Swiss-Prot record:
Location of the region described as Homooligomerization in the Swiss-Prot/TrEMBL record: 253-304
Described function: APOE is an apolipoprotein, a protein associating with lipid particles, that mainly functions in lipoprotein-mediated lipid transport between organs via the plasma and interstitial fluids. APOE is a core component of plasma lipoproteins and is involved in their production, conversion and clearance. Apolipoproteins are amphipathic molecules that interact both with lipids of the lipoprotein particle core and the aqueous environment of the plasma.
One Pfam entry name: Apolipoprotein
Source organism of the structure: Acinonyx jubatus (Cheetah)
UniProt-annotated stretches for the region 8 X 22 AA approximate tandem repeats: 78-242
Protein known as: Apolipoprotein E
Organism classification: Eukaryota, Metazoa, Chordata, Craniata, Vertebrata
Compartments it resides in: Secreted; Secreted, Extracellular space; Secreted, Extracellular space, Extracellular matrix; Extracellular vesicle
Subunit text: Homotetramer. May interact with ABCA1; functionally associated with ABCA1 in the biogenesis of HDLs. May interact with APP/A4 amyloid-beta peptide; the interaction is extremely stable in vitro but its physiological significance is unclear. May interact with MAPT. May interact with MAP2. In the cerebrospinal fluid, interacts with secreted SORL1. Interacts with PMEL; this allows the loading of PMEL luminal fragment on ILVs to induce fibril nucleation.
Region of interest (LDL and other lipoprotein receptors binding), ranges: 156-166
One cellular-component annotation, GO: low-density lipoprotein particle
Signal sequence coordinates: 1-18
Chain sites annotated for binding heparin: L160, R161, K162, R163, A216, Q217, P218, L219, R220, E221, R222, A223
One GO BP annotation of this record: cholesterol efflux
């Protein structure tokens, strides 16, 4: 999931290049936004990326034109290709982790992962095509309609910030659904086992009642024979119930361990990628600042 978070960041960049109508006037004062609640590493990375986009939008006109002419686009494309490799590796690892689960659950999760990977690959291919198209438009518009170019850039950045926040909240909900699904699956397994062996308990109670009625007869020998039969039946049922209780406990413990391992795997996948993205984005910021030169505009302070 960690890698999918990073892939989501890259895939969302495709939306920032969508065609928009040019605004009549560039808004120099950005609209206020709700504060970003960052408690997890990936949330902090999203917050820094979001603030970075706002900072780029506040740059001067000359600096914006220089930014559009840097090699940021090429480096972003390399980052996309690396992310796709990580997504593929993570998907294979996740499918191995889901091996012990039910076949229909494994098939459903694998299908969702394949669909997500296909959508991500399509989005990244669209990003490359749109980047080439937009770069050509920038070169054609330089010196002709700078105000329109700045307005389009500002609109792209605003749309990207909103998409980041919306998709981050959506992914929060999806994680909650998966966690709820794990708990629901465990409860269904326990309920299924209980339904299978509850009739045995009822049968034992019925036999006990019948034997008790027959034992009231004056024939002692018949009562003893029936008593022995009852004890044998009860011992058999007791052993079956005890065996199933042990199996239920083992299965519940196994499912808890799988859930914990799954969460640990998500954390171990995501944290290194967040650090790698932070380093790469830090490199991009340094290049942007190098292009800015002595510009008075400064980048926003990184959230701790």
């Amino acid at each position: 999931m960690k890698v999918l978070w990073a892939a989501l960041l890259v895939a969302l960049l495709a939306g920032c290049w969508a065609d928009v109508e040019p605004e009549p006037q560039l808004e120099r004062e950005l609209e206020p936004e709700a504060p970003w609640q960052a408690s997890q590493p990936w949330e902090q990375a999203l917050g820094r990326f979001r603030d970075y986009l706002r900072w780029v939008q506040t740059l001067s006109d000359q600096v914006q034109e220089e930014v559009l002419n840097t090699q940021v686009t090429q480096e972003l494309t390399v980052l996309m290709e690396e992310t796709m490799k990580e997504v593929k590796a993570y998907r294979e690892e996740l499918e191995e982790q889901l091996g012990p689960m039910a076949s229909e659950t494994q098939a459903r999760v694998a299908k969702e992962l394949q669909a997500a990977q296909a959508r991500l690959g399509s989005d990244m291919e669209d990003v490359r095509n749109r980047l080439a198209q937009y770069r050509s438009e920038v070169q054609a518009m330089l010196g002709q309609s700078a105000e329109e170019l700045r307005a389009r850039l500002a609109s792209h950045l605003r749309k990207l910030r909103k998409r980041l926040l919306r998709d981050a909240e959506d992914l929060h909900k999806r994680l909650a659904v998966y966690r709820a699904g794990v708990r629901e699956g465990a409860e269904r397994s326990v309920s299924s086992i209980r339904e299978r062996f509850w009739p045995l308990v009822e049968q034992a109670r019925a036999r006990n009642a019948n034997v008790a009625a027959v034992a009231a007869q004056p024939l002692r020998e018949r009562a003893e024979a029936l008593g022995q039969q009852l004890r044998g039946r009860l011992d058999e049922v007791r052993e079956q119930v005890e065996e199933m209780r042990v199996k239920m406990e083992e299965q519940a413990d196994q499912m808890r361990q799988q859930a914990e391992a799954f969460q640990a795997r998500l954390k171990s996948w995501f944290e290194p990628l967040v650090q790698d993205m932070q380093r790469q984005w830090a490199g991009l910021v340094e290049k942007l600042q190098a292009a800015v030169g002595t510009s008075p505009t400064t980048a926003p302070v990184e959230k701790q």
